[in-house]
């Protein structure tokens, strides 16, 4: 069974093809480095380490958050964390107004005291409004591809979002994928953008 199918079977995650190719390389590098058979638990740990912030990592196969399972083997997880978000319509109803509270650990993660930031933006939907909001403090990101799906059925269903972002100015931009998981499809989308931004800064 391929890696994509194993993630879909065990964790209800249906990765887009280009994300699948990217993650396959991460798993292959792990296999080449460790010289060991890659088990299902290794795949999930690698996926969490690479794409999911601490608060998203403690999930069952059904996508239910069961607590923080982040451990010392996982890398410190990036600059930004989404604390709260609210979305409303503009005065004429044509635009989306988004307000968010973020925890900003600074560009040099670990070297600065985290700061809570209130940001707001306007766009033709929550994603565009969020990109507008974070651009106000120096984060330049644009969407190249986006996919989403529910992970289960019922009132407690979780949603998964996958986004391919260009992060940074044109001459120094990186193309990276991000993943977000949440009970709200809007919040999962915003978490996927943060995942991509954090990954871009971890890779520098």
Where are these regions (language model features)?
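Terminal or standalone catalytic/regulatory effector modules within metabolic enzymes
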Residues: 4-204
């Amino acid at each position: 069974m391929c890696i994509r199918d194993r993630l879909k079977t065990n964790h209800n995650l249906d990765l887009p093809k280009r994300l699948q190719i990217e993650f396959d390389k991460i798993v292959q590098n792990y296999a080449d480095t460790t010289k060991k058979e890659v088990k299902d638990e290794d795949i999930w740990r690698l996926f969490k380490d690479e794409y999911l912030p601490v608060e998203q990592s403690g999930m069952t196969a059904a996508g239910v958050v069961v607590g923080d399972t982040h451990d010392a083997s996982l890398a410190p997880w990036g600059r930004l964390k989404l604390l709260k978000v609210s979305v409303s319509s503009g005065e004429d109803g044509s635009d989306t107004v988004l307000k968010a509270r973020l925890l900003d650990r600074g560009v040099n993660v670990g070297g600065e005291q985290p700061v809570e930031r209130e940001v707001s933006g306007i766009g033709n939907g929550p994603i565009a409004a969020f990109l507008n909001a974070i651009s106000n403090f120096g984060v330049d990101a644009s969407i190249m591809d986006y996919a989403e799906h529910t992970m289960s059925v019922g009132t407690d269903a979780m949603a998964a979002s996958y986004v391919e972002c260009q992060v940074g100015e044109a001459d120094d931009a990186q193309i990276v994928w991000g993943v977000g998981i949440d009970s709200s499809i809007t919040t999962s989308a915003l978490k996927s953008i943060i995942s991509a931004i954090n990954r871009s800064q971890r890779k520098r």
